Amino acid sequence: MMNRKKKIVIVGGGLAGLALAMKFCERDGEVTVLSYQSLKRSHSVCAQGGINAAIDAKNEGDTPEKHFYDTIKGGDFLAHQPLVRDMCHQAPAIIHLMDRMGVAFNRTGEGHLDFRRFGGTLYSRTAFAGATTGQQLVYALDEQVRRHVHDGAARTLEWHEYLGAVLDSEGICRGAVIHDLRTGDIYTLPADAVVLASGGPSQVYARSTASFVSTGAAATTAYLQGAKYANGEFIQIHPTAIPGQDKLRLMSESARGEGGRVWVPRNANDKRDPKKIPESERYYFLEEKYPLFKNLVPRDVASREIYDIVYNQKLGVNGEPMVYLDLTHKSREFLDNRLGGIMDIYSKFTGVDPRESPMKIFPAVHYSMGGLWTDYGPDSNGLIDHGSPRNQMTSIQGLFAAGEADYQFHGANRLGANSLLSCIYTGLMMARGIMNYTDSLEKSVDDISSTTFDDTRSHWQNRFTDIKAMNGSENPYKLHQDLGNIMLANVLIVRDNKSLEKAWHAIHDIETRFKDVKCLDTNDWANPTPSFINQLYCMIHLSKIITKGALMRDEFRGSHYKPAFDMNQPKDFDPHEYIDYLEQRQYGEVPEGKFPRDHLDYMKRFQENNEKWLKTTVAQHKDNEPEITYEEVNTSLVTPRPRKYD
């Protein structure tokens, strides 16, 4: 290879992309950071509540190993354990790094970092900067990247869209095709590697907490070019958002972490002002059903319980699909200091002061545990080799993924405040591996014929010319709304195969209608319509991945809840019984009377279910449809067992 600096293209200016850009430049590489909008408006800024690390500042006995266990348990054991363990052990150093960069984390009266509790753990391990943690982290990393821009090692291309990878004759990624959203120009960027840190796919649903640019188009394009997509069916539904007709605005888990209580009137016909309803007539259903974790059960659990209260028990506030999230027992000073950001959001969009009256909330589409399939390289002990070129590489050589665009860290359900951690961790961790990958290439990008880049650019120019020529009767924005409503109605909190089959056929109807779309604006300059039509095409394919994965996975795991396959854990069951059961099985038959009969029956069914379904769902694009296969999950460190939070 030529003796020059290695250069990579990073698609996405959120935490994963910025962390990687900083670290790659520190290794004397060159980066181009591509962003659909201003870097400081990347979707990572929307994360409110905090970032996890087991620093144990409050002397509760927390450790990185406990953080690791809580994370894999929260994800229903569907994540590769060596990766998760390494992330949790690196977390304290990441917090201290961000602190040194100037992130304005909240502090105790003594000046130490302050921590709050989040869902799925009994420890205070979430560092936070009021209720704007994501924004503060992005701004700190953005400053570091801008320093490298000043030094000439990095450049940023804001208001540019990633269209696809440039693949050579061997299928190796050699660069990116990008679209200038202002001029309409399409051109290529040669690179030794391309990294997709492009965020999640929440716009597949009609309403969500996510930014309107969270279409998943970049990851879906990779899938259409041959990359594997993993665990698409696992969509996180956040339990607390402001109901709305346009989008759903997040009320951070930090509200419950700071003492917020979820309740409804015990009497479904009680129309009184919530402040006038006495404690005895309030149903704190999470606290009653889960006395250990109370309002801080994991998000999948809380969302299912709220859904049950509203739709099965018919106890929604004033007969509507919402429950109360109550912080009125906290002082205004306390709320403004620790939750000021979300207090202001709720006041602005509802006209009600949450310091004085309980908030009305309901679950909302929030995050995707699934994403592009990515690899990792183990060391001699079966843990993570930070220098492995395989780390975070997709099934397309030279194309990597990080952050919400990849699937590796959260299993079937993400714990709150682990998303910011996984983004920064992957960005920092993968830089060394990418540098080693570029060193290992037998052929440099400089040796690739210019025809490869010209042909790829021409393909996309023709694609956009064809889009602009579309002159049918379908409005693409209305078609997107119809697609999103199909997903909301059929592929949400509670799933059944009949509804999923209905969604599957309806999505194909949308795909047929797409051929009759009309491009409403054919100009080049500052015209978002052709881009949106291309993104809609990607969202149709992504909705097929999500729906088919959900349809084929006949079990209940994490956020994927099919009541027909709920194994109904006995109420007095202790998960440690399952470990004893497995040990007994190793030595032959389980002695008669060792376990209660209903417990034994449950454990047998649980083991059989895990043997079949404790696997990663892998989708590959074949004949215009997702072909689904399954891969084993690395569970070498902790034996998977039933989850229990009460």
Regions found by a protein language model. Name each.
Residues 221, 227-357, 433-436:
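An anion/pyrophosphate-binding glycine-rich loop and adjacent beta-alpha core
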Residues 193-249, 317, 410-433:
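Glycine-rich loop(s) and the adjacent beta-strand/alpha-helix scaffold that form part
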Residues 99-185, 190, 197, 241-249:
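Conserved redox-cofactor binding core of oxidoreductases
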